């Protein structure tokens, strides 16, 4: 069984996750924490999964976060980003017409090619390679998962 640390900024979502956790996990351990996923207090990891954690970051900031995580990660990191496309760009422009309180949280569309370029050029990720990548689409939800492995 794996030892898992699940981190989210929202104490409300962390509490909800605790309530929904299965009672029997087998041989592993699951710890829910409200905080910053980039904090070094969580220790080292074999694998990191960051689902929709970085969709609000511009590509250089996103890669900076990955480099911070890479310092404490041994094997792989899987993360999602908002892939840029003309439909999403139009939706964001229309969304900006609404009052700020009525808008969904802002996402930062990122080109896969541009993201690959920033990853390849970042010294903190020199030992990491892009692995699998897959677009995820369900209804209005669209993201792209990317794997980095050392």
Describe each PLM feature range:
Residues 57-69:
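A short, conserved alpha-helix within the catalytic core of class I
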Residues 1-39:
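Class I SAM-dependent methyltransferase SAM/SAH-binding core
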Residues 105-125:
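Short alpha-helix
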Residues 49-50:
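A conserved beta-strand element that flanks and buttresses the S-adenosyl-L-methionine
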Residues 131-150:
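Core SAM-dependent methyltransferase catalytic element
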Residues 88-105:
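Short, glycine-/aromatic-enriched active-site segment of Class I SAM-dependent methyltransferases
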Residues 73-83:
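Conserved beta-strand signature within the Rossmann-like core of class I S-adenosyl-L-methionine
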Residues 53:
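Hydrophobic adenine-recognition pocket in adenosine-nucleotide-binding enzymes
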């Amino acid at each position: 069984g794996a030892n898992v640390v699940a981190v989210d900024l929202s104490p409300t979502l962390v509490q909800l996750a605790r309530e929904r956790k299965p009672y029997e996990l087998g041989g592993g351990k699951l710890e829910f924490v409200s905080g910053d996923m980039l904090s070094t207090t969580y220790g080292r990891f074999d694998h990191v999964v960051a689902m929709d954690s970085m969709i609000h970051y511009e590509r250089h900031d996103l890669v900076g976060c990955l480099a911070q995580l890479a310092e404490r990660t041994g094997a792989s990191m899987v993360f999602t980003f908002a892939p840029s496309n003309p439909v999403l760009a139009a939706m964001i422009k229309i969304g900006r017409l609404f009052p700020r309180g009525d808008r969904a949280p802002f996402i930062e569309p990122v080109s896969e090619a541009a993201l690959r370029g920033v990853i390849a050029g970042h010294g903190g990720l020199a030992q990491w390679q892009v692995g699998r990548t897959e677009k995820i689409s369900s209804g209005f939800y669209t993201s792209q998962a990317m794997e980095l492995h050392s």
